[in-house]
């Protein structure tokens, strides 16, 4: 009887631990789905040198422009004017379909905080006959020659990589970060605060008879 009770306790304990390590997100859909971001914000700010973000929908519009149209914001400053709660939907790492999207301007958090953000990866390649796969996860996919300053991600933010990738031959490029997954060129992070978690299962399963080169990197700024 004691042995049965002990086993039951152990099963319950392991179940609780599993929930703590790999909790399930409640969000449905992406911030980049039509209707979830403010298209008018893009039209109003297209020619502005300083682009002000005050709502989650405006924040999503900024990301959607990078993700869908490779709008890289060169010579522009994107500035928060309020705390932003991003808990309504998931944030797909903005890299666009060709993985050519990156941010090259100034992102000024102005001391404000992003909360409730759940980042999920963008993926490219990795089919049965494909010898290359790229997985990128972060608020920014890639920053290039950019400046990110006075930005806080609070403890309710998270980067989730819930999938195990089966990859048996070639090159796997895996970049996971919080504020940014990848930085290129002269990039500066100034007075940024990160309290976000990176939550992941084992991410790679390989075969026995093939060769793999795996690159894993990322920025927790």
Regions found by a protein language model. Give the residues of each.
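Terminal non-domain segments
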Residues: 7, 25-26
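C-terminal segment of classical bacterial N-terminal signal peptides
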Residues: 15-25
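Surface-exposed repetitive/solenoidal architectures
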Residues: 26-221
